[in-house]
């Protein structure tokens, strides 16, 4: 019976650590930039966009596709960083668990 209580305490501790890591991750701000820093985006760890900065020279009325590509590049970079950081922080808690 004592072994079961020990396991429960260990699981509760792990759950608290996991929640703290998740709160820290969600509070972190992640940035993504396009080529030449023409577009910069900022996201929370929950993948909520908080800011976008576009340099005036990125806005060419004759080439809207360029601006779209720059935004996509910056957003994808930020999302990749968030995903990597999430895996680094949370992966230790989910390793070995059936999904």
UniProtKB/Swiss-Prot annotation:
Localization per Swiss-Prot or TrEMBL: Cytoplasm, Nucleoid
Cellular component terms per the entry's GO annotation: bacterial nucleoid; cytosol
Gene3D superfamilies: Nucleoid-associated protein YbaB-like domain
Alphabetized GO MF terms: DNA binding
Cross-referenced InterPro entries: YbaB-like_sf, YbaB/EbfC
Subunit structure: Homodimer.
PANTHER family registered for this protein in UniProt: NUCLEOID-ASSOCIATED PROTEIN YBAB
Descriptive protein name: Nucleoid-associated protein LCABL_24440
């Amino acid at each position: 019976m004592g072994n079961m209580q020990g396991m429960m305490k260990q699981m509760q501790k792990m759950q608290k650590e996991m929640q703290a890591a998740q709160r820290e991750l969600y509070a972190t701000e992640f940035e993504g930039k396009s080529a030449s820093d023409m577009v910069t985006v900022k996201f929370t760890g929950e993948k909520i966009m908080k800011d976008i900065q576009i340099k005036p020279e990125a806005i060419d009325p004759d080439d809207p596709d360029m601006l779209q590509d720059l935004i996509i590049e910056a957003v994808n970079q930020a999302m990749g960083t968030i995903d990597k950081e999430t895996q680094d922080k949370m992966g230790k808690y989910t390793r070995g668990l059936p999904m």
